[in-house]
């Protein structure tokens, strides 16, 4: 091997080590700040004055979903990108379980914010019938129903996710399912919740004007 090739290889290895260290420490910082923020949110939304506030219940549920997502996904990410260790690459159970937890909880965090926007829309409505739907009782039913529907909606993950490819990777089965999964993420997580939040926020502003 020539000296120039050896130098290039050393530079590549150095860059890889730097990249791994940045990933590890960046993810650790992100994890600490994310969990700290979520814990503060949980502390605020569990105060006595907010315990029966439906909007606060939705925010608390969103924060809880975010916390579960962080606790499950971030350790795997640190192991994967920082140490090249990822049990989802060779343990099918880990593969299916991790993504069946992270995808629904990530989506739930957004959908609970949608419910909070809908609650504000109902609360600000001049129609007394609409205002009655903004209540602790409605929220106590809506939250578990939403959790159930989202996890049912993502039931295809443990069915169609598998380990394939060289090198092995945990992903959806190639072919039609990959296409479906792309559209599913766009609608259920990428564009659906933000669009509904925008719509109900605009409608709420119209109510309070």
Task: Describe every region a protein language model picked out.
Residues 1-37:
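Extracellular N-terminal segment of 7TM GPCRs
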Residues 2-14, 80-105, 131-133, 137, ...:
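Loop architecture of class A 7-transmembrane GPCRs
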Residues 16-28, 55-115, 123, 127-130:
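Extracellular TM2-ECL1-early TM3 structural module of rhodopsin-like
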Residues 32, 61-64, 101, 145-148, ...:
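Hydrophobic residues within alpha-helical transmembrane segments
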Residues 34, 38-44, 66, 70-73, ...:
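Helical transmembrane-bundle signal
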Residues 42, 47-57, 120-142, 198, ...:
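Intracellular signaling interfaces of 7-transmembrane GPCRs
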């Amino acid at each position: 091997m020539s000296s120039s090739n050896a130098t290039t290889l050393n530079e590549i290895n150095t860059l890889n080590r730097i990249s791994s260290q940045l990933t590890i420490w960046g993810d650790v910082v992100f994890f600490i700040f994310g969990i700290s923020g979520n814990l503060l949110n949980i502390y605020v939304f569990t105060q006595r004055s907010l315990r029966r506030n439906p909007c606060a219940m939705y925010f608390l549920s969103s924060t809880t979903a975010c916390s579960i997502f962080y606790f499950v996904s971030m350790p795997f990410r640190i192991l994967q990108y920082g140490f090249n260790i990822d049990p989802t690459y060779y343990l099918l159970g880990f593969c299916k379980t991790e993504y069946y937890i992270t995808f629904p909880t990530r989506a739930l965090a957004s959908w609970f914010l949608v419910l909070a926007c809908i609650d504000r829309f109902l609360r600000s409505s001049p129609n007394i019938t609409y205002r009655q739907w903004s209540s602790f009782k409605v929220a106590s039913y809506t939250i578990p129903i939403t959790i159930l529907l989202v996890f049912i909606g993502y039931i295809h993950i443990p069915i169609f996710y598998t380990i394939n490819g060289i090198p092995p990777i945990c992903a959806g089965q190639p072919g039609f399912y990959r296409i479906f999964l792309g559209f599913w993420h766009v609608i259920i997580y990428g564009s659906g919740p933000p669009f509904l939040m925008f719509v109900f926020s605009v409608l709420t502003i119209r109510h309070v004007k």
